[in-house]
Amino acid sequence: MKFTDNIRQLIVRHHLLHDGERVLVALSGGADSVALLLVLRDLGYPVEAAHCHFHLRDEEANRDASFVEQLCKRLDVPLHRADFNTKAVAKVQKVSLEMAARDLRYTWFRKLLRERNIRFVA
C-alpha cells in the first residue's frame, strides 16, 4: 500500500477532512511540511500554504522563504506569507523568542483561517 493511501485511510477513518475541503498548510520549507503539502495535494485536497518569516536565522530563513515561494508558484498553490519582528515582540512582551514566535504564528494562523474560511491548519 502506498504512503498516500495510508494517509487517505487515516483521514477517512478519523473523519479529519471532508472531500474537497481546503487545508491551510504551515509550510516552513523543511522536508516534513513540504511532504505534507504534496501528500494533501496529491490526495485531491485544495491546499493553501502559510509561511512565517521570523527574521531570526538571516540567510537560512531567506533561503527557506525563497524556496517556499518558488515551490508554491510551481505547484500553483496560493501562498500567504507573514514577516514578523520577533525580537521586538519578545522584548516588549518579556517572553522568549520561541514563545513570541509561537504566539505570532498561532495568532496569524487563526486570522488566516477566518479570512479564508478554512477549518484546519496542517
Predicted features and spans:
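Core alpha/beta nucleotide-donor-binding catalytic domains of modification enzymes
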Residues: 1-122
